[in-house]
Amino acid sequence: MADEDLLKGVRRLEWARTHMGLLREVRRKLKKERVFEGLRVGMALHVEAKTGILALTIREAGAKVRLASCNPLSTDDSVSLALKEEFGLEVFARKWESREEYYGNLNSVLDLEPDFLIDDGGDLIFLVHTERKELLDSVKGANEETTTGIIRLRAMASSGDLMFPVISINDAHMKYLFDNRYGTGQSTMDGIMTSTNLLIAGKRFVVAGYGWCGRGIAMRARGMGAHVIVTEVDAVRAVEAKMDGFQVMPMMEAAGNADFIVSATGCKDVFTSEHIDAVKDGCILANAGHFDNEISKDALVKASKGIEKVREFVDRYDLSNGKSVYLLGEGRLINLVAGQGHPVEIMDMSFSLQALALRYLSQNHQSLENRVYDVAREIDEEVANMKLETLGVRIDKLTESQRRYLTDWTSGT
């Protein structure tokens, strides 16, 4: 069985490497520049094939790397095994980790005494600032992958508690326009369909949150024939959802007729005790946000007279009011708990940003303040141009006359 899992993991890594042409070019550049030689890099990301290729890329460019999962349920055990046994990478991760295992594995990564961190959700960075403060002198900076982590880190920076510079990969154009929208949209639907084997067409499909992730989910659900309803707390995004052709209403109203409710907000208590009495019997609840607090499991447990696992990633909550609801993947990231995460080509772009931003950090950390920075525009454009090249797409360039026009305020009617 172990041999089968090892072969499965190796094949998944090879498939990912084959289809990650951008990262292959980035690896070539980094090996030539030798900028990572002697560095120690601690990583907390979803441990699956695409992440494995990023970790191997950074190691092949000269760094010593340790990798843990950023979510207790998102590890692909076959890939984790292959990274350790076939490629000799130091990996501390397994699927279905307990809370103690999860934080123990993060601490194992930090035992490397890393120079730089690559995080997803902010737990690794948070740990350095709380239980592992002795590392604040050695950690020179970090990259953060996702919306939820950036929300936490901006709060830390605004309160003066962030003690090293962090680059927000999430806010790069080549990340959120593609990873958050197309990646989350496709992979969330994949996770829902894999876990339930139910039809999407004709169903009432509620998407909580109309940020880039919510946009992607709503777009894909509509494309599969669902009647999509959006819930929001932001008036601007609500107007946008309405103009995009979706119904918009409060969650209390939407829950009563929902066949599916998917949360993608980055905030807690999106679906909680006040919604349980209103929810439609048989409704399926799923989370596409990083943490498992968007759908309140405590509220579901308190309102239930019984809980039963009915499929591998599906728990039925029999409510005291006589209704039942189904929670997918224990309320954690459904696209990684039940699916394989974002498409390979999407993560090729995001992880190329990660590697190039790490290069930028390693070369510029001494001049950076302890706050959250956007990815440098030249890095965003470098990845975009590489992607166009792999797609065989050519675009126009501004002429010198056009450049002068765009910078000349005297030009008018």
Segments predicted by a language model, with ranges:
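Short internal beta-strands
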Residues: 63-76, 229-231
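ADP-ribose/adenylate-binding Rossmann-like module
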Residues: 69, 116-121, 132-148, 267, ...
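A short, aliphatic-rich alpha-helical micro-motif
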Residues: 110-111, 200, 254-256, 276-280
